[in-house]
Amino acid sequence: MIGTPYTQGATRAMLLGSGELGKEVAIELQRLGVEVIAVDRYPNAPAMQVAHRSHVINMLDGEALKALIASEKPHLVIPEIEAIATQTLVELEAEGLKVVPTARATRLTMDREGIRRLAAETLALPTSPYVFCDSLTELQAALKVTGIPCVVKPVMSSSGKGQSVIRSPGDVQKAWDYAQSGGRAGEGRIIVEGFIDFDYEITLLTISAVDGIHFCAPIGHRQEDGDYRESWQPQAMSSLALDRAQHIAREVVQNLGGFGLFGVELFIKGDEVYFSEVSPRPHDTGMVTLISQDLSEFALHVRAILGLPVGTIVQRGPSASAVILVEGESSNIGYSGLAEALAQPNTQLRLFAKPEIHGRRRLGVALARGTSIDEALQTALASAGCIKVHFN
């Protein structure tokens, strides 16, 4: 049973992380009558603007997190980012708190080491060669295992922060320094990954729900500086590669446990499929599903975590998303060009309403459908290009 917000019988969900993905989750929760409490480290975050109420705390502070949960008494805690005191969630789950999908999944996926060791060592799934390092000396030694080129990432980061490619021995110091500056929890451990000469990479949105495991059509995407710039659905791939991708995703998701949507990232080389990463929550490349499916990844996540059946997922045909990425400094951001952007055929816009920008930040996304992936992608790019951002 779901209660009514602001009443004694309300069903309360607490979002830990209130960015653009959390905002869409909040909206879908509210569609089904759930009372939403949005939490983040800064005020006026996107999901806070549509939640019933909000709080600003350091979510890496276990005591602060525990105190807030004790005060609000949520029925569901929904992590939307990695930078959370996950050990606190593990302890609270043992006391009866419902963490989505599970506290274990949140802990394992908060850093790249936990999930990579699960996939490669526990589940024996194919991955790139990798080494974890705690020092520059260890990084230099790791290159003998991974070879050059290789990718260096902090074990805990997102949106490409701290991620770089070593293409020659002269890049090693710079890669180490960048990884140390880009981690979510500050300086620390890194992963060095051997370079897979893949044909393309996909996100396979995988839903674990009361009526079983479900897959969305594969999503292709383009990354730049470790961050997604465009995505499209469906990504064409062989039936054998798709079967292998679904097998890997199913293995990982079932091991992590719980109900919810998981963004499983995979590299594809011919018919070979390699596991890369997984997020136990909606994925940024999956924003294309806001226009490409009858149920977006956010709607699917909410259905699953509320214990509701997913049923059949209808994919509407070639669709694409293009990010509105801006660089600057402002705490008073404005937008123009919306009319021109929406004059593009079969388009939609999402402006995230982020309260400020310091450096480079994703402020919105253009969505489009077309008769082909190329047409949808070009339309989405044209629509995104119409948006002008003003720092007032």
Curated annotation (Swiss-Prot):
One of its GO terms (molecular function) is magnesium ion binding. Belongs to the PurK/PurT family. Its EC number is 6.3.1.21. One of its GO terms (biological process) is 'de novo' IMP biosynthetic process. Pfam families: ATP-grasp, PurT_C, RS_preATP-grasp-like. PROSITE patterns: ATP_GRASP. Keywords: ATP-binding, Ligase, Magnesium, Metal-binding, Nucleotide-binding, Purine biosynthesis. One of its GO terms (cellular component) is cytosol. Pathway: Purine metabolism; IMP biosynthesis via de novo pathway; N(2)-formyl-N(1)-(5-phospho-D-ribosyl)glycinamide from N(1)-(5-phospho-D-ribosyl)glycinamide (formate route): step 1/1. It is an enzyme of class 6 (ligase). Involved in the de novo purine biosynthesis. Catalyzes the transfer of formate to 5-phospho-ribosyl-glycinamide (GAR), producing 5-phospho-ribosyl-N-formylglycinamide (FGAR). Formate is provided by PurU via hydrolysis of 10-formyl-tetrahydrofolate. This is Formate-dependent phosphoribosylglycinamide formyltransferase. PANTHER family: FORMATE-DEPENDENT PHOSPHORIBOSYLGLYCINAMIDE FORMYLTRANSFERASE. It comes from the Bacteria. HAMAP family: PurT. ATP binds at R112, K153, S158, S159, G160, K161, G162, Q163, E193, G194, F195, I196, E201. Mg(2+) binds at E265, E277. Homodimer. It catalyses: N(1)-(5-phospho-beta-D-ribosyl)glycinamide + formate + ATP = N(2)-formyl-N(1)-(5-phospho-beta-D-ribosyl)glycinamide + ADP + phosphate + H(+).
